[in-house]
Every structure is written in structure tokens, then in C-alpha cells.
Amino acid sequence: MHKAGFVNIVGNPNVGKSTLMNLLVGERISIATFKSQTTRHRIMGILNTDDMQIVFSDTPGVVKPNYKLQESMLNFSESALVDADILLYVTDVVEKTDKNADFIEKVRNVKVPVLLLINKIDLTNQEDLVRLVEAWHEQLPQAEIIPISATSKFNVDTVMKRIKELLPDSPPYFGKDQWTDKPARFFVTEIIREKILLYYDKEIPYSVEVVVEQFKEDAKSIHINAVIYVERESQKGIIIGKQGRALKKVATEARKTLEHFFQKSIYLETFVKVDKDWRSSDKELKNFGYQMD
């Protein structure tokens, strides 16, 4: 009998959802940085074997929205509660159990198995961990709690074992050669945005959107033109940097990662444009592929 199902990963920002997703899928699907709100979209990673297909979804961290982009991000997270066969709620040893109580209440009401994963347990001691497990059991009594460390891979195999046991009998939902629902262009934009998150401070990374305007691929190489959109002229100057050095660094590091990702030579040109207040515009967000009510 073949098994298949949707395993959706939810939780607050910066608890290790994307790192866990990449581990479970065995591919670098989601960008992962030390900054919160790195993930903006819902991203599927598909794990295939002869008798099983697990469709993982990484989702944005749950936040109280301050602008329309964050509303879209919350929509992605809430939709993951509706269509899951198994829900992975990821927290960590630092996070308070009552953070984002409204979202936790929605998790409490889901009708599918919930695995509550307490990440980063290498940062605490056994006594505090026991107290944390008890506190989470009170918050989500139906959840099966598994302490993990995504960075050291501790107990990740236990998580995978439970997923396989809980997965429903079903034919595959996608072709067995498919490993994600996203096109190649999406990963280009995410890798460029990852470098911006790493190399710029404060509000700059959160004011950026990346669009691929040209993607031409042949047997050995890919030619890419990408536009980095910011909200203000002052941000454009910061992204470009003195004599273009900052932008050149981003492009160089992105090219290296893209060559590893695609296993081809990459020719990357980057441009910076201003799209005023795009994070608060329904029209622009839809143009950039975000889910709006």
C-alpha cells in the first residue's frame, strides 16, 4: 500500500522551521538565516520513495501583522492548518508558551495529528526542558511532544519515523520525480534575498523584493537578470553601496550559491529599482505572488 500526505510546518519566527524542513526533505528548499521572518511564502518540498510521498510545507513565522505583506505571510501560515494531514508545530527552548495565543488556539482545534517539536534543546538543561514539556502539554494537550535540535540533527530521525507512521494511505499527489512546487525562478529570488538578509542590517532586508526578469538556460549555463525592489530612494543607495561595492558582493555570493544549486555556470546581472511602499499595496503584493484576502 502506498502512503502520501501533506506535512505542514508552522510556528513563530526564528525557531528553526526552515532548517528542519531542509533536513527532512534532504534538499535545500528554504532559505534559512539567523534573522526572523526570513520565509515569506509557503514552500513545498517533496520527499519520494517507492511506497511513499511526503509533501512538506515550510511557512512564514507567525506574527501580528503591521503591514499588508505580513498579513499575506499570516495567511500562508493559517492556510497550512486547514489542509494538513500531519501538523508540525515548531517552538524552541527560549520561546514563551503563550506567545501568539490566538494562533495556538487554532492549532488546538485542528483535527489531524500534531507533533510539537521543541527545537534548540542543546541550549538548555534537562530540568528546564522537563518544565517546558509540561507547560506545552497544558497548552496543546493533544500534541505529541518531541524535543529536537535541528542544527545537530538530534531526534530528527524520530520525527521522520513518526511522520511515516502517521501518514495516510494514498496514491502520490505529485509526480515521483518532482521535489518542489516552485519554479526555478523562485529559488533565484530566494537565494538573492538570502544574501541581502545576511549582508544588510535593520529594515533594509525586510523592504526588499526580488523579481527575475530573464532566465535563459542552456545545457551548461543560465543567464539571469534580476531586479531588487526597495521602497525608498535612500534604500536604493544603501543596497548599491559606495561605487556599487555592496551590490557587487550580493551578486557575487548569490552567483556562487546559484551555481551550486543548479550545478551550472551562472551569469547574473542585478538591478535596483524603487517601488514605493510596495509592502502596503495589495496590487503590488499580488504582482509579487503573495496571497491576499
Tell me the role of every PLM-derived stretch.
Residues 39, 62-64, 96-97, 124-125, ...:
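Catalytic P-loop NTPase motifs of RecA-like helicase/translocase cores
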Residues 27, 46-50, 84-87, 94, ...:
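Conserved, well-folded catalytic cores of nucleic-acid-processing
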Residues 16, 155, 246:
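Conserved glycine(s) of the Walker
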Residues 58, 119, 149:
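Active-site glycine-centered loops adjacent to acidic/histidine catalytic or metal-binding residues
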Residues 113, 122-180:
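Canonical P-loop GTPase G-domain recognition
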Residues 51, 75-143, 216-218:
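Conserved C-terminal guanine-recognition region of P-loop GTPase G domains, centered on the G4
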Residues 1-75, 79-81:
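Conserved G1/Walker A P-loop phosphate-binding module
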Residues 184-293:
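P-loop NTP-binding site
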